[in-house]
């Protein structure tokens, strides 16, 4: 499923900010709700991150809510607020409140993984399970900025003349193991979205190292990580496995930062098996 047929919807937070999401109903009798939380980067959005996955979960009778985080996609891009983990978790909380969702499964990639962990730590009663792909918030800022992908992402400010389409194309190839999988359609999709972004989100982003708090998360957790990840060190998976709790992991070679895009069938199948067998919190 590569085209988004769900109507764009918006909710307004108590602070007056607008948050964009799409709501994809279960095909049959609903088994639960999954909220998909995308990662960071130029041109990122919820649908761009998860367009290869939503249909499989709908067909398995899960309601899927896909939203754009602050500073991304069609959601507001405030320049007067620092983009801390708390601010991103506030956004997720506003979404859950606005849709009257009491307890959901969180599916998060990269920054989205850190936000999912942040919500599980802040309001554990609202999180049933977690499915995370190379989550952020597991290393120090210095460790992340030593990664080739992060260095490339922050070299030129978003919206600056130096951040050209070719720079974006190069960055996208770093997200995956197979560079040939980055086609013109994806580059154009991200480039179009990038035109609406500003540099404030990356300039003020502050995500703490949560690795020493993993043991406080009781919910079942499934983690995917590619060994060729150039953005989040694959060694982070061992921190999470050793951190305690109910943690399972799928480690893939010949895979970069985008497991759900590079290996969608494996990701979808393994995630659905996890959802059906893991105990609810």
Model-derived segments and spans:
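Flexible "cap/lid" loop of the alpha/beta hydrolase fold
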Residues: 117, 121, 128-160
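Conserved alpha/beta-hydrolase catalytic His-Asp/Glu region
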Residues: 146, 161-219
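Catalytic active-site module of serine/aspartate enzymes centered on a nucleophile-bearing elbow/loop
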Residues: 246-281
């Amino acid at each position: 499923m590569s085209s988004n047929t769900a109507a764009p919807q918006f909710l307004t937070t108590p602070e007056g900010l607008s948050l964009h999401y799409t709501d994809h109903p279960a095909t049959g009798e609903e088994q639960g709700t999954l909220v998909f939380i995308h990662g960071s980067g130029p041109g990122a959005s919820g649908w761009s991150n998860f367009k290869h996955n939503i249909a499989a979960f709908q067909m398995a009778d899960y309601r899927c809510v896909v939203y754009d985080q602050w500073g991304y996609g069609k959601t507001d891009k405030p320049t007067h607020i620092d983009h801390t983990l708390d601010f991103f978790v506030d956004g997720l909380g506003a979404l859950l409140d606005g849709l009257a969702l009491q307890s959901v499964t969180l599916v998060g990639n990269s920054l989205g993984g850190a936000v999912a962990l942040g919500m599980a730590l802040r309001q554990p009663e609202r999180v049933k399970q977690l499915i995370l792909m190379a989550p952020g918030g597991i290393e120090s800022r210095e460790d992340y900025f030593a990664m080739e992908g992060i260095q490339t992402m922050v070299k030129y400010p978003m919206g600056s003349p130096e951040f050209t389409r070719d720079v974006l194309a190069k960055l996208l190839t770093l997200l995956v193991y197979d560079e040939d999988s980055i086609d013109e359609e994806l580059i154009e999709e991200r480039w179009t979205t990038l035109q609406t972004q500003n540099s404030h989100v990356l300039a003020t982003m502050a995500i703490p190292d949560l690795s020493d708090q993993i043991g406080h998360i009781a919910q079942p957790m499934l983690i995917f990580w590619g060994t060729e990840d150039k953005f989040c060190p694959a060694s982070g998976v061992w921190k999470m496995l050793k951190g305690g709790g109910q943690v399972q992991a799928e480690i893939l070679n010949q895979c970069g930062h985008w497991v759900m895009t590079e290996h969608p069938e494996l990701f979808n199948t393994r995630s659905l098996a996890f959802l059906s067998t893991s105990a609810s919190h």
